[in-house]
């Protein structure tokens, strides 16, 4: 299983587009009389900064290089002082004020390696993992961001990278990289500071792991389950196609969901559009639902996040895909409305609106335009779509797709989220 950045958790973003506080980004004129939700606060992530803007495009805050907790009310800044030691600042992302600071001896760095890699946070955001940046050793700091427990250092012999950390702070999951796309998932017991013998695999499956616990696949995306115990990742097996790896971070067990629509019969087109697989967690009334969806292929699977199995498969009409490599990789390629009844999906062009009651396609928005990220306002009324080049945000009526305005950004972003009120 690969890494968890985010947001994903659900989307925890490591950085964003730049701009100074109070700067007006001069959004383009409205293309219709549709109104926007003036109180929405957007968080834009990029390579080296995180910028907070309001619904008019005005920069509210420049947070710098931070890791965002779920909901983006809190962020964490990692800074190295002149003596070569590390300071971890806990920031109120609504005000920019530092609420707590911790000192670590030596240099420590965020564990994320890619734009959609794991942020190092547990699903609730309480535990933050930092890594030793030196390539000749493996060491991690497990930090209780509430300040109730002192940071714990763990040194692991060999070469490992971060995968996930349990919400109880007791299990640190690591990826042992082997040859090519082969890997093993291991767990370190945080209280004892030692690596637990054996690999974390689905013992019922022989398709994704051999007798030595060696798995095969490349990471695409991930999200935490409804209560923080399960962590779901999409992997692409090099010959069989995509599957979901489900890791129970509390029980230290794993299950593989192999009945995604194209697993076992993925051709050149399905392999080329692997980056468009996205996971989105939603809730209808009191029941959580997990959607695995690919907007480039028009493929959708409804997954029960409690029983860990596919409940329903569906297809929807999209422009005919080709076997050419994807021109870009969505950072948040699917989003569920807060009321749970609408699923928005990004394709290579356009935004597809899926009715979550029967998994049918209801509409296609912004036909011909390409986007890399989606966010839905808390009142279900407004849809924000980050352009594929990261330089603008389309603001749409979430029910009709009618464009309200376009926010032009001062510099390119690669992810978008809405800050919880």
Question: What are these regions, as identified by a protein language model?
Answer:
Residues 1-16:
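Sec-dependent bacterial lipoprotein signal peptides
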Residues 18-421:
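Predominantly soluble domains enriched in secretory-pathway, periplasmic, or organellar proteins
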